[in-house]
Amino acid sequence: MLGPRPTVAGPAETNHAPLTAPGATRAMEAVLERVIQARLRQARDTDAVFALDMADRLAAYVRRGGKRLRTAFVWCGWRAAGGSGDASAVLRTGAALELLQACALIHDDVMDGSPLRRGAPAMHVDFARGHRAGRTGGSAESFGTSAAVLAGDLALAWADDLLTETALASPHGPRLFEEWRAMRTEMVAGQYRDLRAQASGSSAADEALTIAVLKSARYTVARPLALGAS
């Protein structure tokens, strides 16, 4: 029989959130931590090795943080659209964005072969080191790459689960879904155009502008603002 579905609700989510972007970021991180704890419990119920090797690694990766820029824009969009009072939905949307960003960064580091992320080994490097330490057979680099792709997929699954739960509980759920779907596709499109430009050696201005619009203007600014305003 399936066990109870993990929930991420907590008392702080129903309180009136602080009215500044930095305060909202701190509140979002508290929500994000509850989400992570719930997903880790689910991972442990699924498989102990998976939980220890992958879910715990992903949790540590997300907790290392970053600029949390998209969260700030989600909050600003909510406030600009007249948001006040209960901020639980907007904080959960911001947390979902941070999980989506984790997916994007993990996969980006695999594609670029980047050794570091946020002052620590990139996910594929960390997995490769674990492979070597365990004296497991086969290529450590190949294992690290494959495992990191799966970790990015897991981050995307966590992000989609959280956004779906939030949208289903919101009267504005259809608009949230619409913005989320568009943003995910634009994120992948921007990454592909970047990859394609590198492979072709293109330095055309219109190519660079298209990549900047997809990866930065829309994914980082416009869509988070629209998600908050939804």
Regions found by a protein language model. Name each.
Residues M1-L97, A102, I106-H107, G113-E141, ...:
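Conserved N-terminal diphosphate/IPP-binding helix and adjacent helical/loop segment
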